[in-house]
Amino acid sequence: MSKPQNPVQMAVIGAAHGIKGELRVKTFTGEPMALADYGPLYARDGRAFQITDIRPANTVVVVRFKGISDRNAAEALAGTELFVDRSMLPDDGEEDEFYHADLVGLEVRDDTGTALGKVVAVHNFGGGDILDVTLAGRKGVLIPFTQAAVPDVSVAEGFVRVDPVAAGLVEDEDGDAPREEDFDPKGRPRGPRDAGGNR
């Protein structure tokens, strides 16, 4: 396969590990070891990387790529983002699940349809998925990816609709922020999937 036409980021190469060309790699797959299941991975410039060995190491995997046999060659790859074509990813058909790559770049609208900004990243710091949104004329904000805060997602039409009160962008009519008792942790069965799901 050549350079992906519809790329989805699967990993980013970190620091060299040892002196024999191994690298620490942060994966965005549901199961980190599944990174090797996708065949060649591609850098933005089209270079292909074939995994010849992979093993777990704390929060990353240690990978050996074909043709990378010493520390100097490995160090030169630090920071390289690795992609596969979207067609290589499983489509589980779950209506309320999305790949991070599906959400990044979507326009953010309020309940009236007014454009507020764009999704620039998706994070999960351990408490649930969060959309990183840049708003027109304001600094970026973090919006919880919950049913209350983000009631509608339309990847096909290129937008997410947020409830400004539930998203914490404005106070409600009484001047109150959203109440803790209004929080329903099961309110959104969906959530951004890491690339590749649990393949």
UniProtKB/Swiss-Prot annotation:
SUPFAM superfamilies: PRC-barrel domain, Translation proteins. It is found in: Cytoplasm. Its main location: cytoplasm. Residues 95-168 form the PRC barrel domain. Coiled coil: none annotated. GO terms for cellular component: cytoplasm; ribosome. GO terms for biological process: ribosomal small subunit biogenesis; rRNA processing. Residues 167-199 are annotated as: Disordered. Keywords: Chaperone, Cytoplasm, Ribosome biogenesis, rRNA processing. The keyword rRNA processing applies. Residues 176-193 have a biased composition (Basic and acidic residues). GO terms for molecular function: ribosome binding. The PRC barrel domain binds ribosomal protein uS19. NCBIfam families: 16S_RimM. Binds ribosomal protein uS19. An accessory protein needed during the final step in the assembly of 30S ribosomal subunit, possibly for assembly of the head region. Essential for efficient processing of 16S rRNA. May be needed both before and after RbfA during the maturation of 16S rRNA. It has affinity for free ribosomal 30S subunits but not for 70S ribosomes. Belongs to the RimM family. This is Ribosome maturation factor RimM. It comes from Mesorhizobium japonicum (strain LMG 29417 / CECT 9101 / MAFF 303099).
